[in-house]
A protein has these predicted regions:
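N-terminal secretory signal peptides and thylakoid transit peptides that target proteins
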Residues: 1-16
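C-terminal segment of N-terminal export signals and the immediately downstream linker at the start
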Residues: 22-44
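Acidic Gly/Asp/Thr-rich repetitive segments characteristic of extracellular carbohydrate-active
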Residues: 41-75
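Extracellular beta-strand-rich solenoid/capping regions of secreted or surface-exposed proteins
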Residues: 59-67, 79-93, 100-122, 126-147, ...
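Parallel beta-helix/beta-solenoid
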Residues: 87-88, 96, 114-115, 120, ...
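Extracellular beta-strand/beta-solenoid scaffold signature
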Residues: 103-111, 131-141, 156-163, 178-189, ...
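Detector for outer-membrane/organellar transmembrane beta-barrel domains
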Residues: 228, 330-333
Length: 456
C-alpha cells in the first residue's frame, strides 16, 4: 500500500513538473511572410519603399515564383513600377491596405495574355491618373481561365480599372475608385462572377458585361455597392450607368446597392434572359432598370427604386424586344424630366413602361408625375397583363395604347389612388386621347380588357 501511494505521489509530481515545463512560455516568433502568403519578393532584390523603379526586379520575381508554382508575396510598403506581366500560374499577393504598387507608366500596370490560373490578392494598385490607351485597363487580362482579382484597392486609373476579355474567373471584394473610364469591363466572358465589390466615382460606367456579338454570357453580378457614376463621354444612355449588359445573354444582376448615377442603375441592351432582381436603387437620373432593343426574355423583380426619371422600361418591340415579367418592385419619387438629349419625346415621370408579351404584377408605385404604368408605344403593344398593382399619386394611373394596330392589354385587380388625370386612359403614344376608361369599368376599345379595379 505504501509503495503504491509513493508511486502515485511520484507520478503525480512528475506529471506536474512536466505540465509546468510545457506551460513555460517560449519567445514569440513572428511568422515569416513567405510561410503565410507565398515566396517573399525581397529574396529577388525587390525593396519596399525604395525610390527606385522596380519594374525589372518585380518581373524577375514574378516569373521565378510562377515557375516554382508559388505565389509571390510582397511585404508591406510602396513599390514604384511600370508595366508588369503575369505568366501562366502567376500569383501576386500583398498585405491588404499595406502593399501598394504605384504605376510609373506603360500599357497597363498588370497585364496578361493567354495566362490561366492567375491571381491578384490584397494589393493596392495606384494608377496615378496616368492616361492609358483606348480600351485599356490598369489591370488588363485577355484569354485566360481561372483568373481572380480579389481584395484589391484599385484607384486613379487613367483608363479602365479592370479590363477582361475572354476570361473565366472571379472579381470579388475589391474597391475600384476614380477611374477615367469604366471601373470593370468584361468582353466575351467565359464564366464570370463579379461580387461584393465597391465601385465609386467612375467617369463612364460602373460594371460593363459586353459581347462583340449576341450570345450566351452567363456572368453573375451580385452584391456590389456602386456609387457616383458619371456619363463623362456624354451620349444618350451608353454611359453613366451602374451596370450595363450589352448583347450578353443569361446575365444575373442581383442584390446590388446602387446610388447616384447620371443614367441607369441597370441597363440591358439586347441582353436576352437577363434577371434584374433584389437591387436597391436610389437617385438615378434616367430609367432606373432598363431592358431594351433586341432581347427576348427578362425578369425584373423585387427591386426598390427611389428617385428616377422612369422606374422600369421594357422597350423596343420594334427591334424585337419582348417577353418580360415585372413583379414585386417598389418604385417612388419619379422625376418629371430625363437628362437632356436622352429621349426625343422626353417620356419621363413614369413608374413602369412595357410593350410586348409582358406581365406587370404586384408592383407598388408612388408619385409618378406622368403615368404609374404605361403599356405600349403607338402600335407597338402586344399581350400585356397589368394586375394586382398599387398605384398612388400618379397623374394617370394606367395608360394603354389605343392607336390602330395596337394589341391586347388586360387591366385588372389594381388599386389606383389619387390619379388626377384619370385612373385608366387610352393613349396615342404619350398623349391621352380618351376619358377615364375606369370610371364605369368598361372599355369601348376591344383590345383593352378591363377587369375589376379599385379606384379612389
Amino acid at each position: 500500500m505504501d509503495i503504491s501511494r509513493r508511486s502515485l505521489i511520484n507520478a503525480t509530481a512528475a506529471g506536474a513538473a512536466a505540465g509546468a515545463l510545457a506551460a513555460t512560455p517560449e519567445p514569440a516568433r513572428a511568422a515569416p511572410l513567405t510561410s503565410t502568403l507565398g515566396r517573399d519578393a525581397t529574396q529577388y532584390d525587390v525593396r519596399p519603399n525604395s525610390p527606385d523603379d522596380q519594374t525589372k526586379v518585380l518581373q524577375r520575381a514574378i516569373d521565378a515564383a510562377a515557375s516554382a508554382q508559388m505565389p509571390l508575396a510582397l511585404p508591406p510598403g510602396a513599390y514604384r513600377t511600370g508595366a508588369l506581366r503575369l505568366p501562366n500560374g502567376g500569383q501576386l499577393v500583398g498585405v491588404r491596405g499595406a502593399t501598394v504598387l504605384k504605376f510609373t507608366g506603360g500599357a497597363s500596370l498588370i497585364a496578361s495574355e493567354g495566362a490561366s490560373g492567375i491571381t491578384l490578392t490584397g494589393l493596392a494598385l495606384d494608377g496615378a491618373g496616368i492616361k492609358l490607351a483606348d480600351r485599356r485597363g490598369l489591370v488588363h487580362f485577355q484569354n485566360g481561365l481561372d483568373v481572380r482579382v480579389q481584395d484589391c484597392d484599385i484607384v486613379g486609373s487613367g483608363g479602365y480599372g479592370i479590363w477582361f476579355e475572354s476570361i473565366a474567373g472571379e472579381v470579388s471584394g475589391n474597391t475600384i475608385r476614380k477611374t477615367a473610364n469604366t471601373a470593370f469591363t468584361s468582353f466575351d466572358a467565359l464564366g464570370l462572377l463579379v461580387a461584393q465589390n465597391t465601385i465609386q466615382d467612375a467617369s463612364d460606367n460602373g460594371i460593363e458585361i459586353l459581347r462583340h456579338t449576341m450570345g450566351d454570357d452567363g456572368t453573375i453580378v451580385v452584391n456590389n455597392r456602386i456609387d457616383d457614376i458619371k456619363a463623362g463621354p456624354g451620349g444618350s444612355g451608353q454611359h453613366g450607368n451602374a451596370i450595363n449588359a450589352f448583347r450578353a445573354g443569361n446575365v444575373i444582376v442581383s442584390g446590388n446597392h446602387i446610388r447616384n448615377c447620371d443614367y441607369s442603375a441597370v441597363r440591358g441592351n439586347s441582353a436576352s434572359n437577363i434577371q434584374i432582381t433584389g437591387n436597391s436603387v436610389s437617385n438615378v437620373r434616367e430609367v432606373a432598370l432598363y431592358s431594351e432593343f433586341a432581347f427576348e426574355g427578362a425578369v425584373i423583380a423585387n427591386n426598390t427604386v427611389d428617385v428616377c426619371a422612369v422606374g422600369v422600361s421594357v422597350a423596343n418591340f420594334n427591334e424585337g424586344g419582348r417577353m418580360v415579367t415585372v413583379h414585386g418592385n417598389v418604385i417612388r419619387n419619379i422625376l418629371p424630366k430625363r437628362p437632356i438629349g436622352t429621349a426625343p419625346d422626353d417620356d419621363a415621370g413614369i413608374g413602369i413602361v412595357v410593350e410586348a408579351d409582358a406581365a406587370v404584377t404586384s408592383n407598388v408605385i408612388e408619385n409618378a408625375p406622368s403615368f404609374g404604368i404605361m403599356a405600349g408605344w403607338g402600335k407597338y403593344l402586344r399581350d400585356v397583363t397589368i394586375t394586382g398593382n398599387v398605384l398612388r399619386n400618379s397623374f394617370v394611373g394606367i395608360g394603354v395604347s389605343v392607336v390602330p394596330g395596337a394589341g391586347t392589354a388586360l387591366v385588372s385587380n389594381n388599386l389606383i389612388s389619387g390619379s388626377r388625370g384619370g385612373a385608366i386612359v387610352g393613349l396615342d403614344h404619350a398623349k391621352a386621347v380618351t376619358n377615364d376608361l375606369g370610371a364605369d369599368g368598361t372599355s369601348r376599345f376591344a383590345q383593352i380588357v378591363l377587369g375589376l379595379n379599385a379606384v379612389r
